[in-house]
Every structure is written in structure tokens, then in C-alpha cells.
Swiss-Prot record:
UniProt entry keywords in alphabetical sequence: ATP-binding, DNA damage, DNA repair, DNA-binding, Exonuclease, Helicase, Hydrolase, Isomerase, Nuclease, Nucleotide-binding
EC number of the protein: 3.1.-.-, 5.6.2.4
Top-rank taxon, per record: Bacteria
The protein's name in its UniProt record: ATP-dependent helicase/nuclease subunit A
Annotated ATP binding sites: 60-67
Gene name tied to this protein: addA
Assembly behavior: Heterodimer of AddA and AddB/RexB.
Family, similarity comment: Belongs to the helicase family. AddA subfamily.
Organism annotation: Streptococcus pyogenes serotype M12 (strain MGAS9429)
């Protein structure tokens, strides 16, 4: 029930429907099932929309309408009396939040239109108005709100900023690291610290590897609930726990025993084959069979009696026994077919080999790890202290501050918990533990609504942990009192051809071990409508593989990259789709796993005339050729003795010196100087005093004179003009901006150059001046291996899309090509010198000196890199986590398709059959095989091989070079031009002619009334003043910038410690202060400070206000005393609107504005306006604002029918307040 007030001030009572009971929900589900609607909601969607009063986890498969469910649930909450501002709604991205807000807005508009109840219309309109302020956004955005509001409770200023530029973060990190490193190198424990650094960097002079270790540990800790506690309690967890054989986890022992038993079983299956040859010709057992039987029996016995025969303490002995028992090779051959029976067991034995030796040396590395722990803790504290001093933070800092505020302030936490009716989270599978902690603190324990799909968790590199979702899923299924699980399985996006192949692939591939979830009936995709089940034979999924048996060398030098032949296969299929099926290019999307090596795709498509749009590559703005040329030009202007920059400038198209020219210049050396720079040689060459003046011919001399004259001009201008103007002078003097327009990718190149000028302008606006500072900033960015954001140019709409799989998440496309399926998964992380784990902490490779173990006496040391036991445990978990994420990445890619999916790769046709043992061992591919295969393509081929008797809903085809000839690929069909002899074309031409006549008439009408067309409906006095101002004073031409949105892409690192206060902000604050200042009290500093607290401005602006000057106005001027004497007649910040007639078009328009102050008496009016402009003589401002005050006076006269007898300007921009009568 809600109370509103009607026009008479009487209360209106709105009665809302109660939330639905479980019985009512079942009744609604039945009604929906029996209804004749074309698009019905599923029973699970209805349950997810209307269930209330408990925690709910919605597991929403791809295309199941999760956004629809969220919007409908939010609307239902609103219709049942829950205000939108009482819902916390978290989305993964800002874009998702914007789309969700728009959908809610459209729903509210629709509901208002349908509602006949006046009271409900008023309520829904209020909800619509509140939508902009509702908590719908990312967790980062919400955390910023909390810290801005309550940061004072933990000593954090509300006036902070976010360091979004990685370059700025790296510069600060480097400063903190260097200082701390120096301190640790000179402390008491310095020898241990040096050993730590050498373990990772090899020596103490090169600290890059150790610095990477520290940064990674710091970054990893930031994703935990409490970084400091994690570093103190969990960082060395595995190092403290796993020190003996007995400490090895039972799970790892079980995996070893399982591998032994599986090997025995597989070997038995092989020996039972008809062609194996158990018996000799004489009828006795063959030697091979006898040996294999012994292996089978012993492996089975050791597995069965492990605890009695070995136990954990005897694990090292077991490893030696098994290693001695089985052959060194992996395969058993039967009838020329190789079966990799022993491969998995060999891999497991390798993991446990040399355990005793490793454990013996592992204890020596513990002091090093303690030093590392101390360093990372100290780094975290010092880095945070610097950020607090700068009042500039990373997003993770702000979230941790928000968590700290809620944990340490019970009243604040309870106020949020009481305020939010429900805490809703989208993409829950991609949350990390820091975000989970924040959500827990906001919830009252039974009002969480979480939507996600663990099969689409693909952001592990952002420390997202799918196990958060998984744990909730298990808990709610086992303990229903904790919450409810609702499965959305129906897919409303894809045709059955896509759904069937997805189910076939992942039912054989995904389980808890690899993928983190068993792909069973609970998770399989089901068509949501009958139309999706209509079969299309030509849309069957295709695995198209370029046969690399006779590779023509088209593959890139890195074997991981996509080859020209693979791209040609894609081009051929697209041409076929476009020509034969009429599929528009924008319906086709190419998905790749990374942005690297995509240039070959664009190049090949250009050859075939296929338009393509990419989502961008790695940030390479500063490495683009045109920008590098300009940067070297600026470096040369700053310091001509920089040989590298000077050579780059001379070789650039601006001056076009060739190798011969440079060689001749280089020989003009002064023999008396040891070091001679190129610039000096040029100067000597020009005056003929070089070592070989005869080499400088007239043409070269002319070029050198032009260069020196131009450079001198630029250097002189750099001292006087702005960076922006200098860059444009370079463009214009040497026509470089025009030159790049004639090159490939001209639009992008010109946009890059334009952006450079804008970035230079922004740099100077931020308070820095000069060429040297700008170059230094750019070089700092490059030193930290970073770059500036790329410049986006308008892309064609009718084009094939190329994007990463990550970028495609949440989107859908009719036809999807998954490219480079033969690319190996990146396993770089599992080969690093350290591996981090949330539970186990850090595991490292230890550089041990085994000189004593070997009995070596001649060498000083014998260093061996050992994988410590914690490292091995973390490595195994990381390997499985990596494979699981790659599997989910494939799921995301496949489920983007609406109609058809293609897999593109390359393989040797003759060797592709050797991928797997075709013996079917169950519903899933064997775990060992899934761990062994490291490409999408290998997974698909293994499934096709092992489950060949099933319909897997995809075909495997090998493409030969003969299939990729120009004739075989074909060409795009272009639309036929109009035939003037065709009557239909002639009729169409007549229609176009009539349309052109109509356009001509409209154009003439527009010309006649051009002044009225361009006349704004509403204008302000400031706009009218601007029309007169150019006639009154000389002004400069401002720099044209496209839009504020484009400028945001060009943000430079913010190194300034002081926030620059704009003059407009000071003026706005002064007007607010003069509005709220109580004139009934004596005007003094205290009165002004009290009033200052009430205005809505940041602290920097408030500090910039000169309160003494304001006090002087009221105390020392007659007008200020007039304010206090006649305060009852005073009106402040008064809006007005009058009708005016434009003198040119004679059309009427509305003039609106706000008058700072006026005094209304019985027979006259006194007008006052405050100005904070800087000035030399008051007469300047009198002329500038005379027209504006006349408009104000006219408005007051029209309104009150009284004359304005006095008009005053109060000038606050000088040394003291001055009053000017206008």
C-alpha cells in the first residue's frame, strides 16, 4: 500500500497485489501452457519471474531469455509496490546496464499506456522518473557511490578519481617498487632477499622478472575478499602444508591409482583383441602376452593394496616400481594400429618422479618465500599510500574500500540491507571473490537473485571464479532452505542444427573435471519453439580442414597463426552463401580466440572484395607508422642530436632521404671528435667542411638546406606556440596530413594524426606545458609496454563482422565461422616460474644447488630448477582450469549461431586418424584424452573418431589446394546496372524524376524560409550575447574537437597532483552561494563558511572562492549594504521566459534565462548581475554585458509592467569587488 497526494492535497491510497504463492505460480504456469499465444513463456521462466521470499539462482543456458526474465521480474516487483530504487541490480558491463535500463524504461512506458487507474499511472510515472537514479550498473560503479558517500568513515576523501589508464598505474608502481627494492637490498635480511631475486631474475641487476612476480602477486591478491589477510594467511599456505610425502593430497594419490587401473584395463582390452596374438604357433603364450599379463596383474594388485604395500610414505618407491614395470614407450601395436595405452600413466609418473629429492631441497626455499611475502605486503601498503596521497585509485581499491565501510560500520551496512528489497546480479558466473563479498554484505541473507550460466564463464584472466556459481548450485540443490535453483534450458535463439551439434559435442566433452559442470540433461539445450525444430539439411554444421599434407608454405611463420588457405576456405563459403542463398554480409560473423594475426584475414577478404569490419586489435596507436613518424619529428625538434629520431625523420616521406643520401652524410665526420652526431655532420656538409665534401652533390645540398630551414622554423615555433599548433604546422609545412590520405588505410591514418594533435592539446590543458614534457610522457607510456587507445573510424554496416569470442558473448549472429580451430591453447602460465592459487597460495620453481647431492668438488655450484610440491599441485589445478575455460569458450562460440556454425582449421589428413584410440570407453571422451588434446579441432576430431557410430550433427571435410583455386572459390556477383532499353527501368526512371521534382520544390521552400529554419525555438541571453561579442572584442579561434565522447577515447595519463579548477565552475559556485546566503545575519567569514557547506560543488571549487572578497562586497560597498537593508524586496536566481521576434525571419521564439538578483519595489525595479570574469578595466565588462542586461531589463518590464531604473554589474574577477552601473 502506498500513499500519494492529489491536486487538492488529499491522500490517495494505492493497493498493490501481493506476491504470488507457489500454488499461484503453478496455476499461472498451467494457464500459460494452455493459452493460444504464439510465443509462450516457459514454466521455468514464470517460476524465475514470480518466485519471491528466498535466494534464487537461475542457471540460464545460452539463448534462454535471461534478460527477458530479469526485466519481467523487475517490472513485477514494481507493480507489486517495490520502488525501483529499492532494487540493487548489478550487470557485468556498462553497456549491459544501459540496455537493461532501456528495456525497463520501455516496459514502464508500455505499462503506463495500458493502465487506466490514475493513481497507478502517477506511481509508474514516478518509477520512470526514478529510473535514472536507480542502482542499475556495474559493481565498480556502485562501489564508487558507497565510497563517495561514506569514504570519510575510513579516512578516504570523497573527491577521488579513478586511474583507468594502465600507463599511469605502471608509472606509480615502478616508483614504489624501485624505492622498496632499494630498502630491502640494504636491510638485515638482504642476503636472503638477494637469493630470492636471483631465483627469478638470475641476478640482482635485472629485476624485471622479480618485478613481474611482485606485480602479479599484488594483482592476484586484489581479487580476494581481503588482500592483506590473504597475503598474510593464504599466500604461503601450500608451502607450509606440503613438506612431506604424507602431506600430498588424497585426491592426487587417487588420480595416480586411477591412471594405473585404467592402464591395466586398457591393456587387457588390447590383449583381448582378435589380432593381438596371445598364443604362438605352438599354442603356448607369447612372450609379449606374458609380459602384458604381468603388468596387468601387478598394476591391479598395487592399486588394490596400496595402503598396505606402500602408503603415502612409500609413494616414491611405488613410482620406481611402476616405472621399472611398464615399457618406456606409450604405445601397444596391434595389426599396425598403435594404441597409446601407457601415455597417461607416463604423464602421471612424471608428476611424482624425484619427489624425495624435491622435498629435501624444498625446505631451503621457505625463507625466500617469507621474504617475498614481506615484500608484496610492503609493496601493497606503499602503493596504496601513494594512491591515497594522490587521491587516485584503481577500481579494485574502491571495491575494497566499499567492503571495508560495510564491514566496519554496522549502521551503514544495516541501512543498505534494510533498503534493498532484492539484490539482483546478472552474469553471476563471472564474479570474483571480492565482488561476492560485497554482494553478501548488501544482502539480508534471503533476498538474492542471481542469473548466470557456468558454461559461459570465460573471464578467468580477470580472476572470475566459476566455482562461486558452482558452489551455490550444489548448496541450493542439497539444502533447499538456503535457496532455490531454477534451470532455463529452452533456447529461443538457434535452429535445431546449432542446438543438436552443441549438445552432441559437449555431452561427450564437458564434465566436472574439465568444464566444471557435467553436461547432462539438466544443461542440454532445448528448442524453445516449434519453428526452431524445422530441419534445414544445408545448415548442418561443418568442420572444414585445410589438408596440410602438401602444405604450400602459406602458413604463417608461427604455426599457431591462421593460414592464407584457411581464410580462403572461409571466403569461398561466404561467396557461396552470398551468391547462392542471398545471405547479406552483416549476417556473417567470424570468431577468433585472439586479436593477433587478423591482418591476413582482412587482406585476403580485400582480395575477394568481401567487406569486413573488425572489433580492433591490440592497442598499437603509438606504433602506427604515421604516429611514429610524427613522434620522431617531435623528438628531433626537441633534440636534433638524437640520431635515431633524426634518421627516422630524414627517411620519412616529409624529406625522403634515401640510404645513399644518409651514407654520404655519415661520411662527413670530424676526425678530431671521437663521437660525432648526425646533426653535426649535416651542418658540416652544408658549409662544405666535412671529411668528404665532394660526396655532397647539389641535389643533396638542396635537400639539406630545405631540411635545416624547416627544422629551424619548427624549433623556433615550438618555443612560442602551443603543441597543437606546432603539430598542425608540421602537417601543413610538409603536407604530411595530405600525404597519408593517399596511402592504404588513409582514413585511419588521418584519424590517428588528428588524434595526436588533440592529445597534445589535452596534455597542455591538464597543466603541463612544452614539447619536452609531452615527449617524456609518451616515452614513459612506451617504457611500460603500454599504448594509448586506438582511434575508431566509421565502419561500413553491410560487412562481415570479425571479433573475438570474448567480444561476441551476449550477441547472436545467423552464420558463425569459428576460425583457427587448430590453434593450441595457451599454456604459458603453467610454465612460469611461479603459479598462484587462491587456496594454496604460491608455488614456485626453486633454483636448488645440488652440488652436495652429486658429490661434486670441482664446480662452485650445480644449479637445478625444481618444481616444488606446491608448484606441482597448483600447476595441475591451473592446467585443468585452463582447459575448462577453453571448453567453455568453445561453448560460447558455438551458441552465438542462429542458423549455421562452421569450424575452420588445418590438419594432416594422413595423421588425423592418430589423434585417439577409437575404442569407445563411455559417454565421455576419457579424461586423459581430454587433458592431452590442446585444440578445439582435436576435441572435435576425437569425438568424430570415438563416437563415429552416432549422428554428431557435424561433418568433417578436408579441403585440398585444388579446391582453392581462383576458379573454384568464385567471385562475388555484383548487382546488374539499370538497362535503359528495359521498360520497367524506364518507368522507374520516371518515378525517380517525379521524386527529384518534389525534392526541388521542397528545397526552394527551404531556401525561402532559411532564416526561420535555422532559428532556435528557445534561446538564452548568453547565446544572443555571443552573437554580439565578436563585434565588441577580438577573440581567438578555438580548437575544434569532434565531441566529448571522442575525446574520452584519447585520455592521457593524469600525473598532476592538483586538480585544475575551471573558471566556469567558480562562477557557478558564486551564484549558488549568493542564492543561499542568509542576509538576515551579519555577513562575516563564519556566515559565508556555513552557507558554503550548502552548495553543491567539490572542495577544490569551494576553496577557490574568495570569501574575503564576498565579505567585502557586503560590508564595504553601498550596493552590498543595500542587499541587507532591502532583503524583503530581493529576488535571487529568478528564472524568466519572454516571447521575442527574430528580425530576419520575423518568426517568434522564446527567450529564457535566470536573473541573478533584482529588487522589486512598488514603482520601479533594480537589477543586479554578478560576474567573475577576469578584466583589466571595468569598462570592458560593461560593454560585453550591456546587451545581456538590456534583455534582462526587458523581461522584468514585460513581467511587472514597471521600469528598471538601475542596472548594476558586480565584478568579482579583480583584486576587490567593483560595482559598475550599466
Amino acid at each position: 500500500m502506498l500513499f500519494n497526494i492529489n491536486e487538492k492535497g488529499e491522500p490517495l491510497v494505492i493497493s498493490f497485489a501481493p506476491f504470488l504463492s507457489p500454488e499461484a505460480i503453478k496455476h499461472l504456469q498451467e494457464n500459460e501452457r494452455c493459452s493460444d499465444q504464439s510465443q509462450k513463456r516457459t514454466a521455468q521462466q514464470i517460476e524465475a519471474i514470480y518466485t519471491s521470499g528466498q535466494n534464487i539462482l537461475v542457471s540460464a543456458s545460452a539463448g534462454s531469455g535471461k534478460t527477458f526474465v530479469m526485466v519481467e521480474r523487475i517490472l513485477d516487483k514494481i507493480l507489486r509496490g517495490v520502488s525501483i530504487d529499492r532494487l540493487f541490480i548489478s550487470t557485468f558491463t556498462v553497456k549491459a546496464a544501459t540496455e537493461l535500463r532501456e528495456r525497463i524504461e520501455n516496459k514502464l512506458y508500455s505499462q503506463i499506456a495500458q493502465t487506466t487507474d490514475f493513481q497507478m499511472k502517477v506511481y509508474l510515472t514516478e518509477q520512470l522518473q526514478s529510473l535514472g537514479q536507480a542502482d542499475i550498473g556495474t559493481m565498480d560503479a556502485f562501489a564508487q557511490k558507497v565510497v563517495s558517500r561514506y569514504g570519510y568513515s575510513i579516512g578516504i576523501s570523497s573527491q577521488f578519481r579513478i586511474m583507468q589508464d594502465k600507463a599511469e598505474q605502471d608509472v606509480l608502481k615502478q616508483e614504489v617498487f624501485s624505492k622498496l627494492f632499494s630498502e630491502f637490498m640494504n636491510q638485515k635480511e638482504a642476503p636472503v632477499f638477494r637469493a630470492l631475486v636471483k631465483n627469478f631474475s638470475g641476478n640482482c641487476k635485472d629485476t624485471s622478472a622479480f618485478r613481474e612476480l611482485v606485480y602479479t602477486c599484488y594483482s592476484f591478491s586484489q581479487s580476494t575478499e581481503n588482500p592483506k589477510i590473504w597475503l598474510q594467511e593464504n599466500f604461503l599456505s601450500a608451502a607450509k602444508t606440503y613438506q612431506r610425502l604424507e602431506d600430498i593430497p588424497d585426491h592426487d594419490i587417487e588420480l595416480l591409482l586411477l591412471a594405473m587401473q585404467d592402464t591395466a584395463n586398457q591393456l587387457r582390452d588390447v590383449t583381448d583383441m582378435e589380432d593381438y596374438g596371445q598364443l604362438t604357433k605352438a599354442g603356448s603364450r607369447s612372450a609379449k602376452y606374458t609380459k602384458h599379463l604381468t603388468i596387468i596383474e601387478k598394476l591391479s594388485d598395487w592399486v588394490r593394496d596400496f595402503k598396505c604395500l606402500y602408503g603415502k610414505a612409500g609413494l616414491d618407491r611405488l613410482i620406481r616400481d611402476v616405472t621399472g614395470l611398464i615399457p618406456s614407450g606409450n604405445d601397444v601395436t596391434v595389426s599396425k594400429v598403435k594404441y597409446p595405452v601407457f601415455k597417461t600413466l607416463h604423464q602421471k609418473l612424471k608428476q611424482f618422479r624425484h619427489l624425495e629429492t624435491i622435498l629435501m631441497y624444498q625446505k631451503d626455499c621457505f625463507p625466500l618465500l617469507e621474504q617475498l611475502q614481506d615484500f608484496v605486503l610492503a609493496f601493497s601498503e606503499a602503493y596504496l599510500a601513494v594512491k591515497i596521497q594522490e587521491s587516485a585509485f584503481e577500481f579494485s581499491d574502491i571495491t575494497h574500500f566499499a567492503i571495508k565501510i560495510l564491514e566496519e560500520n554496522t549502521d551503514i551496512r544495516q541501512s543498505y540491507q534494510q533498503h534493498y528489497h532484492e539484490v539482483m546480479v546478472d552474469e553471476y558466473q563471472d564474479n570474483n571473490h571480492m565482488q561476492e563479498r560485497l554482494l553478501t554484505l548488501l544482502s539480508n541473507g534471503h533476498n538474492r537473485f542471481m542469473v548466470g550460466d557456468i558454461k559461459q564463464s570465460i573471464y578467468r584472466f580477470r580472476q572470475a571464479d566459476p566455482q562461486i556459481f558452482n558452489q551455490k548450485f550444489r548448496d541450493y540443490q542439497k539444502k533447499t532452505e538456503q535457496g532455490k535453483v531454477i534451470l532455463l534450458k529452452e533456447n529461443f535463439r538457434s535452429q535445431s542444427e546449432v542446438l543438436n551439434v552443441s549438445n552432441a559435442v559437449f555431452s561427450h566433452l564437458m564434465d566436472e573435471s574439465v568444464g566444471d559442470v557435467l553436461y547432462d540433461e539438466q544443461h542440454q539445450l532445448i528448442a524453445g519453439s516449434h519453428a526452431q525444430t524445422v530441419p534445414y539439411l544445408d545448415r548442418r554444421a561443418q568442420l572444414l580442414l585445410y589438408n596440410s599434407d602438401k602444405d604450400d608454405g602459406n602458413a604463417p611463420s608461427d604455426s599457431e597463426g591462421i593460414s592464407f588457405s584457411e581464410v580462403t576456405i572461409v571466403a569461398k563459403e561466404i561467396i557461396k552463401l552470398h551468391n547462392d542463398k542471398g545471405v547479406p554480409f552483416e549476417d556473417i560473423t567470424l570468431l577468433v580466440s585472439s586479436r593477433t594475426r587478423n591482418d591476413i584475414i582482412s587482406h585476403t577478404f580485400n582480395q575477394y572484395g568481401i567487406p569486413i569490419v573488425t572489433d580492433g586489435g591490440q592497442q598499437n596507436y603509438l606504433k602506427s607508422v604515421e604516429v611514429m613518424v610524427m613522434l620522431d619529428t617531435l623528438r628531433t625538434i626537441n633534440n636534433p642530436r638524437n640520431d635515431y629520431a633524426l634518421v627516422a625523420l630524414l627517411r620519412s616521406p616529409m624529406f625522403a632521404f634515401d640510404e645513399d643520401d644518409l651514407a654520404r652524410i655519415a661520411l662527413q665526420k670530424d676526425n678530431e671528435l671521437d663521437k660525432d652526431c648526425l646533426y653535426d655532420k649535416i651542418q658540416r656538409a652544408v658549409i662544405g667542411r666535412g671529411a668528404h665534401p665532394e660526396l655532397i652533390h647539389d641535389t643533396l645540398l638542396g635537400k639539406l638546406n630545405i631540411f635545416l630551414k624547416t627544422l629551424k622554423s619548427w624549433r623556433r615555433y615550438a618555443k612560442l606556440g602551443s603543441l597543437y599548433d606546432l603539430i598542425w604546422k608540421i602537417f601543413n609545412d610538409r603536407f604530411y596530413f595530405d600525404f597519408v590520405a593517399s596511402q592504404a588505410k588513409a582514413e585511419q591514418a588521418q584519424a590517428n594524426l588528428y588524434a595526436l594533435a588533440l592529445r597534445a592539446n589535452q596534455f597542455e590543458k591538464s597543466g603541463y606545458k612544452g614539447l619536452y614534457c609531452f615527449i617524456k610522457m609518451i616515452d614513459k607510456v612506451l617504457e611500460t609496454q603500454n599504448d594509448l587507445a586506438d582511434v575508431e573510424v566509421a565502419a561500413p554496416k553491410q560487412a562481415v563482422n570479425l571479433m573475438t569470442i570474448h567480444k561476441s558473448k551476449g550477441l547472436q549472429f545467423p552464420y558463425v565461422f569459428i576460425l583457427n580451430c587448430d590453434k593450441r591453447f595457451s599454456m604459458t602460465d603453467i610454465h612460469k616460474s611461479f603459479i598462484l592459487n587462491r587456496q594454496h597460495g604460491i608455488g614456485i620453481k626453486y633454483l636448488a644447488d645440488i652440488k652436495g647431492l652429486l658429490g661434486e668438488t670441482t664446480l662452485n655450484s650445480v644449479k637445478v630448477s625444481m618444481e616444488t610440491l606446491p608448484y606441482q599441485l597448483n600447476k595441475q589445478e591451473l592446467r585443468l582450469a585452463t582447459l575448462s575455460e577453453q571448453m567453455r569458450l568453445l561453448y560460447v562460440a558455438m551458441t552465438r549461431a542462429e542458423k549455421k556454425v562452421y569450424f575452420i582449421g588445418k590438419a594432416s589428413k594422413s595423421k588425423s586418424q592418430d589423434i585417439t584410440d577409437p575404442k569407445k570407453l563411455g559417454k565421455l571422451l576419457p579424461l586423459a584424452l581430454r587433458e592431452q588434446l590442446l585444440t578445439f579441432q582435436d576435441w572435435l576430431l576425437a569425438i568424430a573418431d570415438v563416437f563415429s557410430t552416432e549422428d554428431l550433427y557435424f561433418d568433417v571435410r578436408f579441403i585440398e589446394d585444388s579446391d582453392l583455386t581462383q576458379e573454384s572459390v568464385g567471385r562475388l556477383q555484383t548487382p546488374q546496372l539499370l538497362n535503359p532499353d528495359d521498360l520497367k527501368d524506364n518507368r522507374q526512371s520516371e518515378t525517380i524524376a517525379r521524386a527529384l521534382d518534389m525534392l526541388e520544390a521542397v528545397s526552394q521552400l527551404n531556401a525561402n524560409y532559411e532564416a526561420a529554419i535555422h532559428l532556435p525555438t528557445v534561446r538564452t541571453p548568453s547565446q544572443l550575447k555571443a552573437a554580439y561579442e565578436p563585434l565588441l572584442e577580438p577573440i581567438g579561434v578555438d580548437i575544434i574537437e569532434k565531441s566529448s565522447r571522442s575525446l574520452s577515447d584519447f585520455t592521457l595519463p593524469h600525473f598532476s597532483k592538483k586538480v585544475k579548477v575551471e573558471a566556469s565552475h567558480i562562477g557557478s559556485a558564486l551564484h549558488q552561494l549568493m542564492q543561499v546566503l542568509p542576509l538576515s545575519k551579519p555577513i562575516n567569514q563564519q556566515t559565508l563558511l556555513d552557507a558554503l557547506r550548502e552548495i553543491d560543488s567539490n572542495e577544490e571549487v569551494k576553496t577557490a572562492l574568495d570569501l574575503k572578497k564576498i565579505e567585502s562586497f557586503f560590508c564595504d560597498t553601498s550596493l552590498g549594504q543595500f542587499f541587507q537593508t532591502y532583503q524583503k524586496h530581493l529576488y535571487r536566481e529568478a528564472p524568466f521566459a519572454i516571447l521575442k521576434v527574430d528580425p530576419i525571419s520575423q518568426e517568434e521564439y522564446v527567450l529564457r534565462g535566470i536573473i541573478d538578483a533584482y529588487f522589486l519595489f512598488d514603482d520601479h525595479i533594480v537589477l543586479v548581475d554578478y560576474k567573475t570574469d577576469k578584466y583589466k578595466q571595468p569598462i570592458e565588462l560593461k560593454k560585453r554585458y550591456q546587451q545581456q542586461l538590456e534583455l534582462y531589463a526587458e523581461a522584468l518590464t514585460q513581467t511587472y509592467k514597471l521600469p528598471v531604473t538601475k542596472r548594476y554589474l558586480v565584478l568579482m574577477g579583480g583584486g576587490k569587488p567593483e560595482i559598475v552601473e550599466v
